[in-house]
Amino acid sequence: MGRTVQDELEQIRAKGLFRSTRLIQGRQSARVTMEGRQLLLLCSNNYLGLAEHPALIAASMAAAEQFGSSSGASRLVSGSMEPHEALETAVAAFKRTESALAFNSGYAANTGIIQALVGRGDVIFCDRLNHASIIDGALLSGARLVRYPHNDAVALAGLMEKQRGTGRCLIVSDGVFSMDGDLAPLAELAELRRRHDALLMVDDAHGCGVLGEQGRGSAELLGVLSHIDIHVGTFGKALGSFGAYAALSRELRDLLVNRARSFIFSTSLPPAVLAVSTAALELVQAAEGDELRKRLRDNTSLFRGLLRDAGFFLGEGNTQIVPILTGGAEETMDFSRQLLEEGMFVQGIRPPTVPAGACRLRCTVMATHSPQDLTWAAERITHIGRRLGVV
């Protein structure tokens, strides 16, 4: 007899890796209510606070009234609706590409795109710390997967010289790495793309709306917007909506429409969600978007500075994702529980999300946090961190 579900759950618990969801009441604000207590929220990806913006809520209600509550089927079955076309036109203009295609989630985008682009006889060069959806898409594609050391363009160059092969070649990287908050070396990746006649795909889920002069992401910040073949991003983080996109050439879009299984075999996003995403893109490019990004930068600088001054190791990044390296799973979750008792919700991150021994508190800063919120949070994190011997 094989292992039971109960056996598997007991093994997960024994390793200190059991997970469960927590119920919060109300919106994804800077402060939330959980089990009757008000908490400072320091683990949401709602970086600009748009998830509760009146303009986005109004766009949702208007679209539902005009177009109904559902898209009905896959777009290849029952057709695209006007909100699909409006959003994809807005995404292409935002990312300065010929075309764009909406997906139901970032996971669906990455798995579908990679499987559509490469297969047996092709090769994928993939950063070791890329998001799980990229790894899963690469494994499902059947292409040869070559994983290079994190952000090491020199090592990647050597691997490409030896293992490029003659098939289609795809370089894929996060733009901002979700667990470390550091940036990919996109200029170097773009040069390797040119040198080896490769496609370059960048998942900028955590840079979209936040980085660059108009929030176009890490590629805009680093000056390589036009050197990336497939820009992937999400509407569900800084843009305060749901779903994802690929911004790319018309030819590549046509290929995805015909080959990306996660697009072909899924009922598409509903009109209300599409309208929210379109409204968010307009907002982040306006003066209000500039102000929100500045507020987020200022908040991030304040919070990171306070924690660094206290002696915490925060890795190499300088974005709104602030990892506090803690070590083991049990210590990390104890730290998280004590912070919850103090009045803040900070998520502990354990394997398989991060490697064993690299557990962390993943703090995320929002534009809607006040300086007083972040100063208080840093003080309490420091107090508990010293008590636990983390710093």
Curated annotation (Swiss-Prot):
GO biological process: biotin biosynthetic process
Enzyme class: transferase
Residues that bind substrate: R19, H131, T353
Keywords (A to Z) from UniProt: Biotin biosynthesis, Pyridoxal phosphate, Transferase
Pathway: Cofactor biosynthesis; biotin biosynthesis
Molecular-function GO terms, alphabetical: 8-amino-7-oxononanoate synthase activity; pyridoxal phosphate binding
Database matches in CDD domains: KBL_like
Substrates-to-products reaction catalysed: 6-carboxyhexanoyl-[ACP] + L-alanine + H(+) = (8S)-8-amino-7-oxononanoate + holo-[ACP] + CO2
Superkingdom field: Bacteria
Family annotation (InterPro entries): Aminotrans_II_pyridoxalP_BS (IPR001917), Aminotransferase_I/II_large (IPR004839), AON_synthase_class-II (IPR050087), AONS_Archaea/Proteobacteria (IPR004723), AONS_Proteobacteria (IPR022834), PyrdxlP-dep_Trfase (IPR015424), PyrdxlP-dep_Trfase_major (IPR015421), PyrdxlP-dep_Trfase_small (IPR015422)
Residues modified to N6-(pyridoxal phosphate)lysine: K237
Binding, pyridoxal 5'-phosphate: G106, Y107, S178, H206, T234
Cofactor: pyridoxal 5'-phosphate
UniProt EC number: 2.3.1.47
Physiological role: Catalyzes the decarboxylative condensation of pimeloyl-[acyl-carrier protein] and L-alanine to produce 8-amino-7-oxononanoate (AON), [acyl-carrier protein], and carbon dioxide.
Subunit (UniProt): Homodimer.
Family note: Belongs to the class-II pyridoxal-phosphate-dependent aminotransferase family. BioF subfamily.
Annotated protein name in UniProt: 8-amino-7-oxononanoate synthase
